[in-house]
Amino acid sequence: MNIAKLIDHTVLKPNSKKEDVMKVIEEAKKYNFASVCINPTWVKLAAEELAGHDVDVCTVIGFPLGANTTETKVFETKDVIAKGATEVDMVINVGALKDGDDEFVEKDIREVVQAAKGKALVKVIIETCLLTDEEKVRACELSVKAGADFVKTSTGFSTGGATAEDIALMRKTVGPNVGVKASGGVRTREDAEKMIEAGASRIGASASVAIVLNDEKGATDNY
């Protein structure tokens, strides 16, 4: 298994400097990760640096709270795609989901999906640590209904990250044709393999190099 091609090599800390982002880009070239996942302000740089390399440019929308308006999320999506993003990880409106406003949640996702159509993959972050199992299932069902390419566990900025149990539940809910991304707290090769075994088709990690090299020390970041 080429585990590197399942990893979004991630740097999303608010205090990340250009040198931190460049380090991630260079590592992505070296190890041929699926993508680099960076904050929107770095998308143009990453797209320029990764031109000609088989590494996608992934960024985040409505991040990390998901509480932006739909119009803002749509604007962000169009803006980052224009700057070179080929994958976007959007955060759902968690409060609306908890209120049972499924129509709003689906519309919020669908409008981002439509803004990205044919230009970028859309991964929907449901923030599993804040949800009941019933809400996790509902969030996944609404994501599929809205046309998302992936569902994703976590931002890495809330109270918890990916668990194998959540991945299994998400995979069971979305079926075989929608991706499932495990993110938050995946720090070692063993962590990554557990997630893949449970049904993950993508891993979000900042410890990507340690995972590929099977370096047990891993990393300490939540993401």
From Swiss-Prot:
Keyword annotations: Cytoplasm, Lyase, Schiff base
InterPro entries: Aldolase_TIM, DeoC, DeoC/FbaB/LacD_aldolase, DeoC_typeI
Catalytic activity: 2-deoxy-D-ribose 5-phosphate = D-glyceraldehyde 3-phosphate + acetaldehyde
Keyword 4Fe-4S in annotation: no
Main location: cytoplasm
Pfam families (alphabetical): DeoC
Top enzyme category: lyase
CDD domains associated with the record: DeoC (cd00959)
Pathway(s) this gene product operates in, as recorded in its UniProt entry: Carbohydrate degradation; 2-deoxy-D-ribose 1-phosphate degradation; D-glyceraldehyde 3-phosphate and acetaldehyde from 2-deoxy-alpha-D-ribose 1-phosphate: step 2/2
Protein family membership: Belongs to the DeoC/FbaB aldolase family. DeoC type 1 subfamily.
Protein name: Deoxyribose-phosphate aldolase
Native source organism of the sequence: Bacillus cytotoxicus (strain DSM 22905 / CIP 110041 / 391-98 / NVH 391-98)
Gene: deoC
